[in-house]
UniProtKB/Swiss-Prot annotation:
Protein name listed in UniProt: Arginine biosynthesis bifunctional protein ArgJ
Catalytic reaction equation(s): N(2)-acetyl-L-ornithine + L-glutamate = N-acetyl-L-glutamate + L-ornithine; L-glutamate + acetyl-CoA = N-acetyl-L-glutamate + CoA + H(+)
Family matches, as PANTHER family: ARGININE BIOSYNTHESIS BIFUNCTIONAL PROTEIN ARGJ, ARGININE BIOSYNTHESIS BIFUNCTIONAL PROTEIN ARGJ, MITOCHONDRIAL
Enzyme Commission designation: 2.3.1.35, 2.3.1.1
Positions of the catalytic residues: 186
Subcellular location: Cytoplasm
Length: 399
């Protein structure tokens, strides 16, 4: 497997575009992704009980066997907007279907931005028309820009691998910066591939991959009303997968997982106001569930995140988060490392160099390892530090 250029348009048969429709003052705000051959679609949606209109429509459409397009607007979430919001989301589907000549049941729709504000429908529909006209094999970067809200950088990646003498590609774009918390919430990610497989297998694979990637990130502990991860597989590589035992499936899942983790880490790294990425590794746990729960809990701890920002080796905040994660632990078995600096052994503090620990916490990517010494299950979660700028950004988000 190797990294390539092209994002969501790297796989065969995919086009994309991103345009400025006027929802935002000057930046791109409407994106369309289109598969020239109807693709098998799979998706995972936010677990927030309050779901935006586009999410409800996409949850219905994903039941269809085939998905040909994804339409997205940023700058307005179209959430908590009542019947007017549902009508607006349907109009987005109608306009996209008309422009591309496809059934509206083959379209996923997504929105992201401020909650509770009516969607400026005419601007969005005009943007959809412009985006459909601008669709190209080079449009992934523009689409990645058009789905951004408080993101500081667009997020896209693509990889390819060889199997059965053919080349398979997987590409993706994502957005997310604030309101990021585990359990499939607060971000959008769209992944394309030219491999072919049945819907049930694709959906199962996506769910497993999401649990290892997007569900393992946290920026601020808030779960959004709008977010989803979707994957479209159009089969144009000529490689068709029927079972999990096949070499092609194993290579595809590995590629999908790589793309998803790269996008998830990019979201965590770009957390609102963040200055560094935090990676928490929980090793030698009794179960995968326990390892994941503890890793997510530590990355979500505001006290720990603030300590990382201040380069303060306050490991007490880590062990405290381990303790309130809701899992059975034996403190006397636990070791904790800040990078390479061991600060806790068998539940007892060790003397360590504050300077060395500070150096570890000053890195762009801070790694914390929590060894439970009780089993063989491991998990990794990602987050970011908590800074003054996070408060500044969110104190005036609407205005």
């Amino acid at each position: 497997m190797k990294k390539i250029q092209g994002g969501v348009t790297a796989p065969e048969g995919f086009l994309a575009a991103g345009v400025h429709a006027g929802i935002k003052k000057s930046k791109k705000d409407v994106a369309v992704i289109f598969s020239e051959k109807p693709a098998v679609g799979a998706a995972v949606f936010t677990t927030n009980k309050v779901k935006a209109a586009p999410i409800l429509l996409s949850m219905e459409n994903i039941k269809d066997q085939l998905i040909s397009a994804i339409v997205v607007n940023s700058g307005n979430a179209n959430a908590c907007t009542g019947e007017e919001g549902m009508l607006a989301a349907r109009q987005m589907l109608d306009e996209t279907g008309k422009c591309l000549g496809i059934p509206i049941s083959q379209i996923l729709v997504a929105s992201t931005g401020v909650i509770g504000v009516p969607l400026p429908v005419n601007k969005v529909l005009n943007g959809i028309r412009m985006a459909c006209q601008a669709l190209s094999r080079e449009g992934s970067g523009a689409a990645a820009e058009a789905i951004m809200t408080t993101d500081t950088v667009p997020k896209e990646i693509a990889v390819e691998f060889e199997v059965y003498g053919k080349t398979v590609k997987v590409g993706g774009i994502a957005k997310g910066s604030g309101m990021i918390h585990p359990n499939m919430a607060t971000m959008l990610a769209f992944i394309t591939t030219d491999i072919g497989m049945e819907k049930e297998l694709l959906q199962e694979t996506l769910r497993e991959v999401v649990d290892e990637s997007f569900n393992m990130i946290s920026v601020d502990g808030d779960s959004s009303t709008n977010d989803m991860v979707a994957v479209l597989a159009n089969g144009l590589s000529g490689v068709w997968v029927e079972s999990k035992e096949e070499e092609a499936y194993l290579k595809f899942k590995n590629a999908l997982e790589y793309v998803a983790i790269c996008l998830a880490k990019a979201i965590a790294r770009d957390g609102e106001g963040a200055t560094r990425l935090i990676e928490v590794r929980v090793v030698n746990a009794e179960s995968l569930q326990k390892a994941r729960k503890i890793a997510r809990t530590v990355t979500s701890s505001n006290l720990f995140k603030a300590a990382v920002f201040g380069e303060d080796a306050n490991w007490g905040r880590i062990i405290t988060a381990v303790g309130y994660a809701g899992e059975e632990i034996t403190v006397e078995k636990i070791d904790i490392y800040l990078g390479k600096v061991k600060v806790l052994q068998k539940g007892v503090p060790l003397p360590f160099s504050e300077e060395e620990a500070k150096e570890e916490l000053a890195r762009e990517e801070v790694i914390v390892t929590i060894d439970l010494n009780e089993g063989d299950a491991n998990a990794v979660a990602w987050g970011c530090d908590l800074t003054y700028d996070y408060v500044k950004i969110n104190a005036s988000y609407r205005t």
